[in-house]
Amino acid sequence: MITTQTLPTLQPSDTSWVILAGGQASRMGGQDKGLIQLNGQPLVQHVIDKLAPQTPTLLINANRNQSQYQQFAPVISDEFPDYPGPLGGIHAGLSHAPTDWVGFVPCDSPLICDDLVARFCQAVKPESDILVAHDGEHQQPVFTLFHKRVLPKLSAFLARGDRKIILLYDECHTSYVDFSDAPSCFFNLNTPQELAQFGALHP
């Protein structure tokens, strides 16, 4: 009789999660988006409130106002001086997080669902390098879970000047996590108008 051995499901406690707050926020007039107030709290605090019950290890990727972010969680910064978008934060997270699996979310999504980490963990396969959320219509490339074995490939990718996150996903064993029943999880706030509207709709 041949038996197949299944790998145990990755546990949320065996993951670290990084909140990406290192962008330039040009559509927010250059303001540091994670520190913008929403209903009396900085945006990054809303994200922490959603993630903290799901995972024991949280980090913040920030490239300015690090001392302010340090009040919320340990801060890591990009190693690349040209700030290569979210891949710079992902590179920093993979370099500094204590676990083999490292997840990433943006700092401007206050409606992250309560089982986001569990869904990612349950979707991990033996061959997985990267997992990316999918809302049923589109992939959500900055809601993602990476294994640290991707770090050398990511370093080479950035060193040759590539900056498009989706191109990296095409080069790795990437699979997608179904969030078609929870598309609001990925709602993000990009402009002052969206921020004001969201605050009014969600007092």
From Swiss-Prot:
Name recorded for this polypeptide: Molybdenum cofactor guanylyltransferase
Chief location: cytoplasm
Binding site for GTP: 20-22, 33, 61, 78, 108
Keyword terms: Cytoplasm, GTP-binding, Magnesium, Metal-binding, Molybdenum cofactor biosynthesis, Nucleotide-binding, Transferase
Locations listed in the record: Cytoplasm
Required cofactor(s): Mg(2+)
Binding site for Mg(2+): 108
Gene Ontology biological process: bis(molybdopterin guanine dinucleotide)molybdenum biosynthetic process
SUPFAM superfamilies: Nucleotide-diphospho-sugar transferases
Organism: Vibrio cholerae serotype O1 (strain ATCC 39315 / El Tor Inaba N16961)
